[in-house]
Design a protein with these regions (language model features):
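Rhodanese-like catalytic fold shared by cysteine-dependent sulfurtransferases
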Residues: 1-21, 29-71, 80-122
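Short, surface-exposed ligand- or partner-binding patches at beta-edge/loop junctions that are enriched
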Residues: 75-76
Length: 122
């Protein structure tokens, strides 16, 4: 049976996070500042504003995703970027345990979940 990208609602996302999945917010820094981030999330920008893969993404991502079985939870604003990235991580890289927040942080907040303020590191 082929591996597919897991879909998760905010409620399912919380359960997967409790189960030890690594949570990665793949948005850009200005988005983290605007909406905040999900508590416990790693912040690793995946795409530039023009849609290119960010030059630092692979190094930062694979420092967390040590092997194909690493449980990963991705989220972005609406789920579009994470769907594209998650499918690539499964189909091209060979990861086997990747989920994404299907409708992104927009749905997370609409569902009444809170975010933590993001503080730039530099």
């Amino acid at each position: 049976m082929p591996v597919v990208l897991g879909q998760s609602s905010p409620t399912e996302f919380i359960e997967l996070q409790k189960d030890g999945y690594i949570v990665i917010d793949i948005r850009r820094e200005e988005e983290w500042i605007e909406t905040g981030i999900i508590e416990g999330a790693e912040t690793i920008t995946a795409f530039t504003e023009s849609g290119q893969l960010h030059k630092d993404f692979q190094e930062k991502f694979f420092s967390l995703a040590k092997g194909p079985e690493t449980p990963i939870l991705l989220y972005c604003r609406t789920g579009n970027r994470t769907e594209m990235l998650g499918n690539a991580l499964i189909n091209q890289v060979g990861l086997k345990n990747v989920y994404h927040l299907t409708d992104g942080i927009d749905e997370w907040k609409k569902s009444g979940n809170v975010t933590s303020n993001y503080t730039p590191t530099n």
